[in-house]
Amino acid sequence: AFDISIVALDKVWLFDGSMTTMPSEEVIKRSVEKVGYQHIRLDSAASTIFLELPGMKIGFGSIGKGYAADRGREIMKAKGIEAGIVNASGDLSAWGSPPQDDAWKVGVNNPFKAHRMVKVLRLNEMAVATSGSYEKYAEINGKRYSHIINPKTGWPSVGLASVTVSGPSAEFANFLS
């Protein structure tokens, strides 16, 4: 499940190739205690956000790319650009169609075979986002740990190598993937 406050775990798991040992159960447990969107208080009148738990953090990195792609699409459409794709680090937001075709063709990578596709999507006024454990991970003692963290347990997700979601919004597709 998506939780904007999962940023409290950003120092527990490192997915930049530098992590060589497992974090302790205690470190994970202490970090998970700082996660929970239900502890975020929004005050619209004062334009403030209050984080109830000490050490709690929020971050938009996980959905920010989709949001940026959607905003880019909206700006270009408002400027009269009739067709295009905004690619925000793999989160795509498309409108119109390319010359001499009726849809944008976007390949979905095969997580088990490099440089191979499992599907080609045809996009018009659509967005697509993919999240997967096959490109960004930590390898410890020969085992790969996904960068997709379960906010309730603090542990990397297991069982899915890749999830691709298409829909009208890259932000929402990213959220679901």
Task: State each model region's role.
Residues 1-177:
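Mature catalytic core of soluble alpha/beta enzymes
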